[in-house]
Amino acid sequence: VGQDATISFK
């Protein structure tokens, strides 16, 4: 996947 909206807040 590209983004992980769990802990990865880019």
Curated annotation (Swiss-Prot):
Protein name: Unknown protein 15
Record organism: Pseudotsuga menziesii (Douglas-fir)
Lineage, uppermost ranks: Eukaryota, Viridiplantae, Streptophyta, Embryophyta, Tracheophyta
